[in-house]
Amino acid sequence: MIHTTRLLWFAAGFTVSQRLILLHPAHANDTALLAHERTHQEQMARVGTLTFWWRYLTDKAFRQQAEVEAYKVQIAHGANRDTCAGWLAGNYWLGIDFATAYALLQD
């Protein structure tokens, strides 16, 4: 894991590969965010890193599934569901509104 401020304007963390997570220093102790990013590492381990990134960037349904899984883990580690739904609805080019994102994040 590397702590860096060189992330996209909306990102607190970013999983590059199965072995590399970038976290903004302001979130260095955010265990819920780290659990979210580790979920992406597990997803990469399941399908392969290159396959993960190809599908994540080209397949909206795959991207949504990957983020919903990761946000559910983040919520289970104490993150606020409203906050996570806002991020899910607004930052992944999924074409969903807050209510839809919130519903996707319910158990």
Segment roles from a protein language model:
Residues 78-107:
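Long, well-structured alpha-helical subdomains associated
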Residues 1-5:
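Juxtamembrane/interface helices at transmembrane-helix boundaries
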Residues 6-22, 27-32, 43-74, 82-88:
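Post-HEXXH active-site segment of zinc metalloproteases
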Residues 36, 40:
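Histidine-centered divalent metal-coordination motifs
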